[in-house]
Amino acid sequence: MKTKILSLANEEVGEISLNEDIFAVEFIRDDIIKQVIDWQRAKAMSGNHKTKTVSEVLGTTKKPFKQKGTGNARQGSLRSVQMRGGGVAHGPRVRSHATKLPKKVRKLGLIHALSEKCAEGKLLVIDSLKLDKPKTSALVNILNKFQGKSFFVIDGNEVDINFSLAAKNIYNTVIVPQIGANVYDIIRHEYVLLSQEAVSVLEERLR
């Protein structure tokens, strides 16, 4: 499958052949894409939520009042779960939310996400993702030429430092090396910009 190579000025400068097994899968598997996104989001969760149990709450262990004769229900401790300021029964604990997902499925998810963007016409190949100076205003003007609201930019094995610094303060714009290409960011951004180097490295990686 052939597609245009664009410059950062959004002008056609050539043509590139894309591997159809990676960028033009015939049937897009949304279920696989969702599986991978769920796996990514679960892995990213901090899991540091926690409540205190009866044994962890600070307070006395003294019986609040005598067993009989008060007319109240019997109580053994002010730290019990039914008492105000007491512990929490079956509350959240610190844990990892990460789940396991086979590499084969993760790879398929990336392929189908790239194919989906390509089918929408929102995957663009750029000849070079390099800037002379790390100027945010200059990069904003460049991205405005593509008329998109959000951009996921994938470079080769290394990201141009000037491009990276310029993109830091731009809302909904993320730049990563090819190893950082992931399904969640591809789907949640409107446009995916790939450098020529990124295309060749991704095709080699996902073959």
UniProtKB/Swiss-Prot annotation:
Source domain of life: Bacteria
UniProt cross-references to InterPro entries, sorted A to Z: Ribosomal_uL4, Ribosomal_uL4-like, Ribosomal_uL4_dom_sf
Pfam families: Ribosomal_L4 (PF00573)
Recorded GO CC terms: ribonucleoprotein complex; ribosome
Signal as UniProt keyword: no
Its job: One of the primary rRNA binding proteins, this protein initially binds near the 5'-end of the 23S rRNA. It is important during the early stages of 50S assembly. It makes multiple contacts with different domains of the 23S rRNA in the assembled 50S subunit and ribosome. Forms part of the polypeptide exit tunnel.
Family to which this protein belongs: Belongs to the universal ribosomal protein uL4 family.
Protein name (record): Large ribosomal subunit protein uL4
Species: Rickettsia conorii (strain ATCC VR-613 / Malish 7)
